[in-house]
Amino acid sequence: MLTKTQAIVLHAIKYGETRLIVDMFTRAHGRLSFIVSLPKSPKSKVKKQYFQPLTMLEIEADVRPKVQLQKIRDVRLAEPFSTIPFDPNKLSISLFVAEFLYHALRGEQQNVPLFDYVASSILWLDAQQASFANFHLVFLMRMSRFLGFYPNLDNYVSGDYFDLRESMFLPTPPAHREFLQPQEAEKVQLMMRMDYSTMHLFQMSHAERNRLLEVALVYYRLHLPDFPELKSVSVLQELYKER
């Protein structure tokens, strides 16, 4: 079926001399893999740089059920970035987010609210001039709402523990080891209440930010089967070291 849809590039790998296999999250069909031919002519509409992580595209594709690699008929940039490719901090964050989405969205079917959340988040990061050091933390924590394991924050009481396995705040620690002590549980519930416009109010040290990232990734590994250790984490953890 010939389909026109918005798409976000998650990952691309070279396949032979002139082709790429590109994983995308599409608004119309969810997660799909495409085989893309790269013409040698510089005048071609299809450019290799279109398939950098998190690039937002408008594609026309022949989408067929049960086909592993779909074919793209036409492609253009939907939202050209103005800062992400040129800002080292934003670029590091975007590469982490792309790797995270590549694993978190495996098998994801059409989910328009989730697509819109991811797209609007990327555009926010691109437009922001400052105060985005906590972006990746808020992005991960709020995305759990769309994947079905966002905790009920209304039940939180100061001094509660946070059960990572059951996504619950509790007055006493659970019987297993996957939980946070009250001090860290309080920080997590604060971050989950924040959005991009208010997250700058949450002041953290470099060590605290990295610890919350570690907690968020443990949380995802508990709830998403086969969610791996992410290679880009080490680079992300070096950001804002002086802060």
PLM regions: where:
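Non-catalytic alpha-helical scaffolds and adjoining flexible linkers that form interface surfaces
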Residues: 1-21, 25-243
